[in-house]
Structures are given as structure tokens and as C-alpha cells.
Amino acid sequence: MELELDLGDLDLDVDLDADAEPAEPRYSPEQLANAKGTVGVISLGCSKNTVDSEQMLGRFVREGYLLVADPLEADLLVVNTCGFIADAERESRESIDEMAHIKQLYPHKKLIVTGCLSQRYGAKLLEDHPQIDLLLGAGHYDTLIPLLEAKAPQTVDHVTEPDAAASHDVPRLITTGESSAYVKIAEGCNNSCTFCIIPKLRGPFRSRTLDDIAAEVALLTDEGCHELILVSQDTTWYGRDLPQRSSLTELLQRILASCEAPWIRMLYLYPTLVKKELLQLIAREDRLLPYFDIPLQHADSQVLKRMQRSERLETVRQLVKDVRASVPDAILRSTFIVGFPGESEAEFQTLLDFIQESQLDWVGVFTYSDEQGTAAYDLPDKVDARVAEARRDQLMALQQPITSARLQRWVGEIVAVLVESYDEEHACFVGRFWAQAPEVDGQVLIQCNEELEMGIFVPVAITQVLGYDLYGDLLEVDDLPPDEELA
């Protein structure tokens, strides 16, 4: 069951003014009287958490609750947290505090906290935030509404071991617009990266079945979704844990047979599992976007060894060559960590050299976050935070002109752009073409003199590069060159 929801309904619009009045109600008195209550949700963290939030919202709607964007209108304040690194934890705790402040102003409201932060800290989170009425971890969201509606008094802490990824028959309110949706193909992770706490929070890798995913993508595309974005902690590991062993390649073939979505994108591909069979399939099938999101984390062999990653400098070099040889129009995106314990100037220079050599299309850079509970937390030779930040800035300064140069090849080309929003500041419509993933990459700014419908493909002639974005003119479909298709 898939429904659509405007993004504004997912993230609460917070105003901490003690004298603030609720915004103009979006529901009639009759609707409010017939509803079980009103719910507002703050969803933090990654795309996998977004899917969890969408399923929570779907369950609330199915059970007769109304969704609101203004927390002053909400009877239930839900914060779905992220606890991956220090910055994410800080944002989650600030959001909890903001909702707790509103609860103090309006004591009848209930504050529910879910997600990775509650999975990580459990009862300790209740000590830090005593205003919480109900605490759930990273999963078992099917128990949320029964716990809230139970007649007998309930304990607050209901954090348990995480469960499997929810199936397609769980109601879900899509928050990413009518044209694009994340498809979570698995839960958990089997890798042992020393910097990462996710396996402790989300458990081991558990794949959804081929049938279940096929049913979901068919439903999504039947309802007008043009872009399916496959996500998990390690998308290339898919199917290896199933009783009847499968693979990402088999899943992709099943998805192609199950739906007509023109864009099928994969995120979080573990480098050592990007094999020839997968590359050949992507090269062969036009609907499988040749967009490779492969988090490499570093390029120096010794740093990778301390991170407990399988690859080494020569293997990551070879991977880039293999992808481009097999899929000539491939877009390569990766993320890197700088300031990992023991990272020397020479090891950092190896990373800089790799960035210059590999000419990746998109790069994200993070400073190492020293997380208690990870193996890296106990490593010696911690890098000073100021040094790590300087290295991050240096790496991004190196990558920016590379990205701009890679984008230049699109100038003069006509591309199909998926229209997603209108930018008031620049007075233009905004969308993405196939080489841009949502939220993490640049966008296409569309110059036109007409109103465009959201969620459709339009032909755009790219005229210039603006930082990480592209700028272009809207064309009529009749202006497309022969054999040019929109998707």
C-alpha cells in the first residue's frame, strides 16, 4: 500500500515561541472529531530511515490518525532519530529537546522517540530526556500504535533487537514526491568496518525476498513513480543470506521484469562486490542507470587496513578502471573519511593523489567521528580535529574543479530532466537528470516561460555549469533530435 505525501508533512515546522498559536488548521472540525488524533514526525538521517518514517506514517493513517506539519497541532510528536556519528546524534538530541519543550507547553501531547539513537542508548536516552513517553529502537514499528493505544499503563522503554525490513504490504506514505521513491531491499550489515556502529544498531544483513521487492516496485510504478532508488547498508550483498541464495544481479533482473520504471538507481555499492556480471547487466539495460555510488572511504592501503576494509589502493584503482571500461558513460560517486586514527600526511597525500588520478564525478568527504562502541574508538594516534577539518577542506577544494570539469561535458547536450520543485530565489524550475542522485548531488536549473508539472520528464538543453549544478533551457518535445528519448 503506497500513498503520496507532501514532504512538508514529514518534517515538523518548529517554532519554540512560548506564545505561539497553532497555524490555521488544515482539517475541518468534523475530520478532527472523527480522527484518533493528530501526528507530526521529524525524520532524521539516511534514506533508509526515511523509508522507516514513511512506513510509520502509513500505519498512523491506516489506523485513523491525521498528519500535521505544525507541532502545535500534533497530539503525538514523533522523532525518528539518527545516531550514526556525533553530528547526527547532536541533531537528534536537539530535535528531541525541541519537541520536549513543546510538550512542556502543552502537557497533553505525547513524545515518541524511535530510530538509531534510541537503539544505541536505550534507557540512557530516557535519563537524558525524561519527557519521552515512548521509546522504540530501529524497528518493530508495528508495535508503536498498539503501545500508544493500550488501556493498561505501559513502560516507556521498548527498545529490542532490530527486526527485518518491512514488507511491501506495510502501508507507506511516500514523502519524496510522486516521481521518486526509495526501495529498502534489506536491513542491517555484515561488514566490520572499524569506524562504523551500524551493525550494532541495525543487526546483521537481512534481505527482503525477491517476490516482496518485486511486488513493491510494481505498486510504486503503477502509481506513477519514475525513479526507483534501491538502498540498504550494503546493496551488493543482497540475497546472499536468503535460504534460496540470490544476488543483486538477479534482483535487478526481477525488477526489470516487474515494472516499467525508466530510472532504476542503486546506492551503497560495496566496492569488492561490484563484479563483472553486475557491470555487464548495467551496460546492457538502459533502465539501470549507470550511476555507481561506491563508498571507498580511503585510498591508502594502510588506512584501509586499519578501517578493516577489504580493498587496497591497487584494487580501488582497478575498480575505477573496470567500471569505466565496462560502462563507458558511468557516473562515479564516492565518499571518503579523513582524519582516521593514525592517518599520516603521507597517507593523506595518497588519497589526494587518488582523487586527482581517478577524476570521480561526485565526492563526499567526512571527518572521522570517534564513536564509542566501534573498534576504531580504541585505536591510538588520534588525529587532531582541526587537522582533520583542514584535510577535508583541502580534499574538497581539489575535487570541486574536477566535478566542474566532469559536468562541462553536458554543456551543449539535451538531457531528460525530472521536474521536482520551483526555486523562488532563481525564478526557475529545478530537477535532476539521470547522473544526479537526490539530495547528495547537484541539480538542473530549468529556464522556461511556462508552468511545469511536477514529476514529469522534460527536455532541457544544457547551457552552462553553475558550481555543482547545471543550467539549461526548456525545449519542446518536438525539438528533440531524432532517436532522442526523454527517459
From Swiss-Prot:
Identify the InterPro entries for this entry.
Answer: Elp3/MiaA/NifB-like_rSAM, Methylthiotransferase, Methylthiotransferase_CS, Methylthiotransferase_N, Methylthiotransferase_N_sf, NA-bd_OB-fold, Ribosomal_uS12_MeSTrfase_RimO, rSAM
Q: Which PANTHER family match?
A: RIBOSOMAL PROTEIN S12 METHYLTHIOTRANSFERASE RIMO, RIBOSOMAL PROTEIN US12 METHYLTHIOTRANSFERASE RIMO
Q: What class of enzyme is it?
A: transferase
Record field: catalytic activity: L-aspartate(89)-[ribosomal protein uS12]-hydrogen + (sulfur carrier)-SH + AH2 + 2 S-adenosyl-L-methionine = 3-methylsulfanyl-L-aspartate(89)-[ribosomal protein uS12]-hydrogen + (sulfur carrier)-H + 5'-deoxyadenosine + L-methionine + A + S-adenosyl-L-homocysteine + 2 H(+)
| Segments forming domain MTTase N-terminal | 37-153
Q: Where in the cell is it found?
A: Cytoplasm
Gene of this entry: rimO
What function does the entry list?
Answer: Catalyzes the methylthiolation of an aspartic acid residue of ribosomal protein uS12.
Q: Where does [4Fe-4S] cluster 1 bind?
A: 46, 82, 116
The note on cofactor binding and number reads: Binds 2 [4Fe-4S] clusters. One cluster is coordinated with 3 cysteines and an exchangeable S-adenosyl-L-methionine.
Gene Ontology MF terms? 4 iron, 4 sulfur cluster binding; aspartic acid methylthiotransferase activity; metal ion binding; protein methylthiotransferase activity
Please list the residues that bind [4Fe-4S] cluster 2: 189, 193, 196
Sequence ranges assigned to domain Radical SAM core in this UniProt record: 175-406
Naming one, the record's GO cellular component terms include: cytosol
Keywords tagged on the record: 4Fe-4S, Cytoplasm, Iron, Iron-sulfur, Metal-binding, S-adenosyl-L-methionine, Transferase
Name of the protein in question: Ribosomal protein uS12 methylthiotransferase RimO
Source species, domain of life: Bacteria
Q: Which residues form the TRAM domain?
A: 408-476
Which one GO biological process term can you cite for this protein?
Answer: tRNA modification
**What is the source species?**
Magnetococcus marinus (strain ATCC BAA-1437 / JCM 17883 / MC-1)
Q: Pfam families of this UniProt entry?
A: Radical_SAM, TRAM_2, UPF0004
Family per record = Belongs to the methylthiotransferase family. RimO subfamily.
Task: State the signal peptide span.
Answer: none
Where is it mainly found?
cytoplasm
